[in-house]
Amino acid sequence: MIKYGILFTKKKWGIYMLKSWTPGEMPDKEEMKMQLEKTKSRLYDLQMKIKEHKLPVLVLFEGWSAAGKGSMIGKVIKNIDPRFFKVATMSSPTEEELRRPFLYRYMKQIPEEGKFTFLDSGWMEQTVMDVLTGELEGELYEKRIESIRRFERQLTDNGYLVLKFFMQIDKGEQEKRMKKLLDKEDTKWRVTGADKWQHKHYKKCENVIDRYMKDTNMSTSPWDIIDAKDKKWAELQVMDTLVSSIEV
């Protein structure tokens, strides 16, 4: 396991949540390139172990707008046989889904034995949005959190590997990335009104996210905060965590 910054401390669950988190030291480019190739190769090899041991792996990617959640999933799945994974991007719930228990639509995405499911945002994003809009507070919030903790515990108790990544960038980096997208005709559509609102209210969103992460950080399904300012460094952190978690 690579002993750089966050990778070295990630198993100390319950300590490094968002507001108290600081990025680890990024390795030099040559070291990073070498380690990334090793972890990619190892992840490719571990597919058969996952299949043989019938290990279902659920990987949840959360993070700030423009932090690179979708592109990171794209990089990871390049190293996995398409037969062994699926990717789910969770849009706004339908009317039918709103009538069902909150976690219903996520339960439908859990992986089969020996396969991966990668979720591009999930129950964290929806919960944070519900808090920010005032729909979820007090006892309702506590019940939601307890249902999420119970859901994740049930998965891990039944042999699922649950990994939760939060792609972290600061407000300045987010502004820079959004401006780059908005400046080009073919990419400006990617910045939504919700993205702009989040950027304007970055601190408020950070407070809600930080509380949520503390409330749902468990030894069996801890949060891994990924320093996403540098894309290659972010990829190495994610790949190393995937490999080391499967090898345990």
Positions of PLM-derived features:
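A glycine- and Lys/Arg-enriched "phosphate-lid" helix/loop adjacent to the NTP-binding pocket
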Residues: V131-S147, R153-N207
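NTP-dependent small-molecule kinase module
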Residues: C205-V248
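Conserved nucleotide-sensing/catalytic segment adjacent to the nucleotide-binding pocket
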Residues: A88-M90, E95-L140
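Pre-Walker A adenine-sensing motif
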Residues: R42-K51
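Hydrophobic positions on the alpha1 helix immediately C-terminal to the Walker A/P-loop
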Residues: M72
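Charged, amphipathic alpha-helical linker segments immediately N-terminal to NTP-binding catalytic cores
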Residues: G14-Q35
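Conserved lysine of the Walker
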Residues: K69
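Post-Walker A helix-loop "phosphate-sensing" segment adjacent to the P-loop in P-loop NTPases
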Residues: N79-K86
